Design a protein with these regions (language model features):
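Helical "lid/coupling" subdomains associated with nucleotide-phosphate turnover
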Residues: 2-7, 21-26, 45-76, 85-94, ...
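Short, glycine/acidic-enriched loop or turn micro-motifs at the edges of active sites
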Residues: 14, 181, 261
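Short, small-residue-rich loop/turn micro-motifs
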Residues: 34-42, 202-204
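Low-complexity, Ser/Pro/Gly/Ala/Val-rich intrinsically disordered tracts
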Residues: 138, 142, 146, 150-153, ...
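A generic, well-ordered mixed alpha/beta core segment in the N-terminal half of proteins
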Residues: 173-187
Length: 360
């Protein structure tokens, strides 16, 4: 019987705080877990002021404190945090980290873009022999809920979708896209790890605040948003997209996996779900046409109508248009015809890293 340790990963993003409390066996498989997501919007107003606001910090500190308390109550042996774009660029990052560390009672790690890419990659393509933790989660803030695990496929192995390890079959290469609140990460990988990656300043929160001032967005705002996205895509240096594009041609058969709240939200909208179900979203294949249709559909709706889409909710509805435009233009630019959606990502990679270095 493989030994089990309970660990936790905390993804402190520009839009969301995502938590995974997981049981990991000696083969680095996540065998049970509790997933939580909170739209704390740490980066609210950051693109305009360059600072994390007091309101956003208080909101994030409160939720992070409750989440780490929950993890301790559930008996985690080690917890690992990873903060991304917002804390990399905020001018008051040091004081924000101090406050978050006081609330959480553990170190806050500001990840470099390379570290973020590594944890996204290992998390998105991780083994997922996954069942829900039986424990309730007392003390969580209103609006918090556990997310159901992926459905089991024949033989008891959780369905992982293209690009993931399934049973004894090793992942042999692929491409991962993470559209986040403050940045978009592109990762080219092989069976032995990351070949190269690039983090672009294209985030749902930052682009919404910068370009989309009207409700619904004006046509000139959408054009400016699209032009900006295409300009940034053409500037990618560490992962030149002109070199990536041939890898993604249909004959190359390189799997493309999409992670992050923007991608999973688009999948849920495309599926027409009345409410978000990770069981349905996990492994769903989004075509380029579906993504473009979703972007156009959302851009025509006022916020009040977007909020009525059960899979979005108010906070995601506010930034859904920018997220859909980023993914749509990225897939067009790279000639990607389909994206397999993964509900895993950075928090999974952090949890696996915590398990790999247990407390002494």
């Amino acid at each position: 019987m493989a030994s089990i340790q309970r660990v936790a990963g905390f993804d402190i993003g520009t839009n969301s705080l995502r938590v995974l409390i997981a049981d990991v066996d000696s083969l680095s498989r996540i065998v049970a877990g509790l997933r939580l997501g909170f739209a704390v919007r740490l980066g609210e107003g950051l693109s305009e002021t360059g600072r994390v606001s007091e309101t956003a910090l208080e909101r994030t500190s409160r939720v992070l404190g409750k989440s780490t308390l929950l993890a301790r109550r559930l008996g985690t042996s080690r917890m690992l945090t990873g903060a991304t774009h917002a804390l990399r660029v905020a001018t008051n990052s040091a004081e924000v980290v101090n406050d978050l560390e006081e609330a959480a009672g553990l170190p806050i790690n500001i990840l470099t873009p390379e570290e973020e890419a590594y944890y996204i990659y290992t998390g998105a393509l991780s083994d997922s022999f996954f069942t829900a933790l039986p424990n309730a989660f007392p003390g969580a803030s209103p609006g918090t809920s556990p997310v159901a695990p992926p459905p089991a496929s024949p033989g008891g192995v959780a369905s992982t979708g293209a690009g993931a390890t399934v049973g004894e079959r090793a992942f042999e290469g692929g491409f991962v896209i993470d559209v986040g609140g403050g940045s978009t990460t592109l990762i080219e990988g092989s069976g032995t790890g990351i070949v190269r990656s690039s983090t672009l300043p294209l985030g749902c929160v930052t682009l919404t605040e910068r370009f989309l001032k009207h409700d619904p967005p004006a046509s000139e705002e959408l054009r400016a948003l699209g032009d900006h996205i295409m300009t940034e895509l053409s500037r990618a240096q560490s992962l030149p997209l002109s070199q990536v594009r041939p890898l993604l041609l249909p004959e190359a058969q390189v799997p493309v996996t999409g992670v992050g709240g923007a991608v999973t939200s688009i999948a849920a909208v495309s599926l027409g779900l009345p409410y978000y179900e990770s069981r349905r979203v996990e492994g769903h294949i989004l075509t380029r046409d579906e993504i473009e249709h979703c972007a156009q559909q959302l851009s025509r709706l006022p916020l009040e109508e977007r909020e009525k889409i059960g899979t979005l909710g108010r906070r995601r509805a506010e930034i859904a248009v920018a997220g859909a435009f980023i993914l749509s233009l990225l897939t067009c630019h790279l000639n990607v015809r389909r994206v397999t959606v993964s509900t895993r990502g950075l928090r999974y990679g952090l949890a696996l890293e915590a398990a790999a270095h247990p407390a002494g």
